[in-house]
């Protein structure tokens, strides 16, 4: 359900200031920060603030700052999720003027009063990674892929916006992620490492940061890569953190609990929070960790909270559109919590929603469906690819399950069926086709697999049942399966394509990311700019140096 936004005061203030500036003949652009010029690296970035920067003081300095980062989330993930939600609500992904933006279940941030775009390249590639892009967002500097908050030489470290807000202004700091707390994006707000894979060292820096609230997935390598180091959780407790590893313990935390590390009681692939499709009823969603963070951080000193929807990226790497859309919606639900807080403190709160890069090369449109989409088909997917791997594929391998038996599970869990099974379902009165309405191509929305698709699935089944860790994939096999379980990724590929969407990669792409802003200083984030400017805009708004 969408939240009502109290935006009138902010918009009126911005308009009043704009008129005043016009009357006074004030220049549209502001002088570039001196720190901006110091950020030049082997791949120089544009660090000039957008023209709207002159309006940055229109609503004052934000006392409460929320920075939501959808890892791997760019325009395709946002738009496909919003279209999908519209299709579920209206029976079609189309509608009248503004219907996609205005429908009741639209993403909570999609019509924030200010929207911008940020380019994402790093010093290595136009297709950057999370370590370097999060470094750009948190410090205003470009660096190599895989490096966190250090320069290309690995000798100069950069102080993050979170560290500066804590040290210079006394803000409380929260870091929340649906993946591991020492993964690249959350780490980029508190650590400084040449390699994002130095998980134990990153964990040590997490403890040394003395940030107030960490919440999300478990720490990777908590006793070191060789499992011979002091346990990070014990070190955190020794440093004064309350380590909550059950939901009951997390629920018991409050404003007077002091520093806390909260680990999801229900852990899934890679010791992360489960995909939203797999989350058990009654267990915390990303939004619940944000709610608890507000409870623990709110106070006279102000706070900064970074919230990462990290499983969006993981789902896109695996080309799992159903999980991608569900986790993008989960991020939107977390933003809803911040909107509720904003509505209580509209003059003191800034909410930013962005991505670090795009993952997977997701597209709305597929050659096999021409101009049509059948997005409701994705609602037939009941679990993520990861849960299918652990709960089903592992059993298939162990028990030698036949292809015919596997097809029964595919129909139950993903809606994909054979012509024979679909005929029986029709006799039983079961309807599985998309209800999206289109002027043509209705039959192409069917969930009945063609002979071509069925052959692809059987080939993938055979590969899954016979391959070992030593199996080397051919170029053709890699393009078909990437590094994923052939059966699982082929199922999601077929369902994606029958829904009218597709992926072009198992890696990151070079698309710009959206930046949505609402609240104090929102005008700074309008326009097209570099991702480093997100840092410089926050620094300008808060006055940190």
Language-model features and meaning:
Residues 57, 99-101, 177:
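PP2C/PPM-type serine/threonine phosphatase catalytic domain
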Residues 25-28:
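Bacterial signal peptide processing site
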Residues 30-56:
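Extracellular mucin-like PTS domains
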Residues 19-23:
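C-terminal motif of bacterial Sec signal peptides marking the signal peptidase cleavage site
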